Regions:
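Noncatalytic carbohydrate-binding groove/subsite architecture in carbohydrate-active enzymes
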Residues: 180-284
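Substrate-binding cleft and catalytic face of glycoside hydrolase catalytic domains
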Residues: 38-42, 75-219
Length: 423
């Protein structure tokens, strides 16, 4: 810690580096970042489809009208989610439950996609899986009927005002203790022989842990690959070292790569406001975008005691961490190259769209960081910013001036900041 008698030195440092008034204790230890953040506006990476979560009326009850506004609106005290995931119930008599929230999401400009847990019961058989005689799988002679079942859901939603952006073949076919198992070869067969008849974009295989043995066969089979539009996966327990997917880079041209379900770092009851634990959420999104090149990031239940929206309908600390991306990095924006780790425990990603450059900077250390940002192959005159810390939630900061294509900013200890530069 710096002695309070040295406070004038802190103030001078702020002045000389064009920093605004710090939101943390002015006597707290501050460091100068080890390196600049260089944002190369012309170095384009993946197109971002959006950020969002799951609504599951059959499981935990539907979102209320007010909660839909909080989830999909992009005003003050709203999350700005641009993706909604819904459930394909095996019983078509329950499909109506998905309509109202999906229509609200569409009204706000979000995209809606659907994932099934089970086929209709008459299409399922039990089998012996490693001693479990109650394990379920799709009957081999029902693959075409199952594709039609998915088509029927697409048609039902369309007739009720919801054009699904895409539909999945199966939720977590490799972790199906309570739903339907698929082996890699079964998924491959369906993708090759039946997925082409589905009247929507197709997501597969939605592994629970990004296990490549489920998706490699699809990528290596030209017909199956032609019938897959989006490679979707979940990231439960997936190590960051497994986020990159070289085979997808090699074979997946023209295909999207989505992270379609996760909660992180845990699902502890009433954990959504824990701090600084909630910073793990923005850090996980950062790694998904930068290390995994994912184009979508979808949370599990939108409303849950460990989710982005608490049971009372208010936004949690985890939700505000998501909002640092979802409110500012809008569908169609493109991730651009940026120095991803300019200082210990500082993580940066950058995006562009609508004549803006959006930078999300996470400081997980217990020390504030004075960071220089350099815009390369692009220019701006002023930068707006929003900060979430232990004591603030998406709090607007003072605007920062850009001089010679660079600006200085203070990253408070244990905080996330989103910067928006109008080009």
């Amino acid at each position: 810690m710096i002695s309070c008698v040295k406070k004038p030195i802190c103030v001078l440092l702020v002045c000389f580096t064009m920093l605004s008034v710090m939101l943390t204790d002015p006597c707290a230890t501050e460091v100068l970042a080890a390196s600049d953040v260089t944002v190369n506006v012309s170095a384009e990476k993946q197109v971002i489809r959006g950020f969002g979560g799951m609504n599951h009326p059959a499981g935990i009850g539907d979102l209320t009208a007010a909660q839909r506004e909080t989830a999909f609106g992009n005003g003050q005290n709203q999350l700005g989610f641009s993706i909604l995931r819904i459930h394909v119930d095996e019983n078509r008599n329950n499909w109506y439950r998905e309509v109202e929230t999906a229509k609200s999401a569409i009204k706000h400009g979000a995209i809606v996609f659907a994932s099934p847990w089970n086929p209709p019961s008459d299409m399922v058989e039990t089998f012996n899986r490693n001693g479990d005689t109650s394990a379920k799988r799709l009957k081999y002679d029902k693959y075409a009927a199952y594709a039609q079942h998915l088509n029927d859901f697409v048609t039902f939603m369309k007739n009720n005002g919801v054009n699904l952006y895409t539909i999945s073949v199966q939720n977590e076919p490799d972790y199906a203790h309570e739903w339907t198992w698929w082996t890699p070869q079964e998924i491959l067969r369906f993708m090759r022989e039946n997925a082409g008849s589905i009247n929507a974009r197709v997501i597969a295989p939605e592994s629970f842990q990004y296990l490549k043995d489920l998706s490699d066969p699809i990528l290596n089979d030209p017909q199956a690959l032609a019938n897959m539009d989006i490679l979707g996966t979940h990231l439960y327990g997936t190590q960051i070292s497994h986020f990159p997917y070289p085979l997808f880079k090699q074979k997946g041209a023209g295909k999207d790569l989505w992270m379609t379900e996760v909660y992180y770092p845990n699902s502890d009851n009433n954990s959504a406001d824990r701090w600084p634990e909630a910073l793990d959420v923005s850090h996980h999104i950062h790694n998904s975008m930068v290390e995994g090149d994912f184009q979508a990031y979808v949370w599990w239940y939108i409303r849950r005691s460990y989710g982005p929206m608490k049971e009372d309908g208010t936004i949690s600390k985890r939700g505000y961490n998501m909002a640092h991306f979802s409110k500012f990095v809008r569908p169609g924006y493109v991730r651009i190259d940026a120095t991803k780790n300019p200082n210990a425990n500082v993580y940066v990603s950058a995006y562009k769209g609508d004549n803006k450059v959006v930078i999300v900077a996470i400081n997980k250390s217990s020390t504030g960081v004075n960071q220089n940002f350099v815009l390369q192959n692009g220019s701006a005159s002023q930068v707006s910013r929003w900060i979430t810390s232990s004591s603030s939630n998406l709090q607007p900061g003072t605007n920062l001036n850009v001089t010679g294509n660079h600006f200085w900013a203070h990253l408070p200890a244990q905080s996330v900041t989103t910067f928006v530069a109008n080009r």
